[in-house]
Amino acid sequence: MDPKIKIRGVNFFYHKHQVLKNINMDFPERQITAIIGPSGCGKSTLLRALNRMNDIVSGARLEGAVLLDNENIYSPNLDVVNLRKRVGMVFQQPNPFPKSIFDNVAFGPRMLGTTVQSRLDEVVEKSLRQAALWDEVKDNLHKSGLALSGGQQQRLCIARVLAIEPEVILMDEPCSALDPVSTMRIEELMQELKQNYTIAIVTHNMQQAARASDWTGFLLTGDLVEYGRTGEIFSRPRDKRTEDYITGRFG
């Protein structure tokens, strides 16, 4: 099966500072791909390049190609709004809107033109169920999303992404602000979601990458040192730098 996303010869710069160097990497469809590496190695920049979130940063510039279903998302005539509908993002800190739980999830569909209440009701319930949150909030949909626990807020943010029916979900350190129990819930949720979505996750947590992902790429100072099946990366790394990082010798 052709990868959902392919990165080919990508260099990325903030003004004159090069952050990514000749990256070639695949993101297989309906699989979880982890991007690991020490702080400042370019992980989040790489992830954000997959839906052009870096466009909003002054001086940001990408060379090379990022292909979604074999279409270069950096083509001049590409519809970026539609791209971000197809490739949704969950951030490090849960960031629910100061709105009701219902309105948080309905926000995207409304922006995209859905106005019929019965249809919004369906989308909100489906998305909250997919995010494993429905049973916890179904009787309190009118309450503020900010009143939820940290783990619930992050699942609400995942539901908000699911409501716009993406094909790819990007997760930038989605569990770093959560307790171990909430982290486990998110990891279990990821395994369920990959049945229907392609997932890319940035994580500092080696155990999480080993547990939750199918493929792993190791970045170091902007270079993709190694990429392959997660089991092989963690049990038989080909590069000594990979072995040193995953065993905690640096990072």
Swiss-Prot record:
A single BP term in Gene Ontology: phosphate ion transmembrane transport
Entry keyword set: ATP-binding, Cell membrane, Membrane, Nucleotide-binding, Phosphate transport, Translocase, Transport
Keyword hit for ATP-binding: yes
Chief localization: membrane
Subcellular location: Cell membrane
TM stretches of this protein: none
Enzyme Commission number(s) of this protein: 7.3.2.1
Catalytic activity: phosphate(out) + ATP + H2O = ADP + 2 phosphate(in) + H(+)
GO CC term (a single one): plasma membrane
Residues that coordinate or bind ATP: 37-44
ABC transporter domain boundaries: 5-246
Single GO MF annotation: ATP binding
Top enzyme category: translocase
Annotated Pfam families: ABC_tran
Membrane protein topology class: Peripheral membrane protein
Stored InterPro entries: AAA+_ATPase, ABC_transporter-like_ATP-bd, ABC_transporter-like_CS, P-loop_NTPase, PstB-like
Similarity remark: Belongs to the ABC transporter superfamily. Phosphate importer (TC 3.A.1.7) family.
Function: Part of the ABC transporter complex PstSACB involved in phosphate import. Responsible for energy coupling to the transport system.
Assembly description: The complex is composed of two ATP-binding proteins (PstB), two transmembrane proteins (PstC and PstA) and a solute-binding protein (PstS).
Protein name from the UniProt record: Phosphate import ATP-binding protein PstB
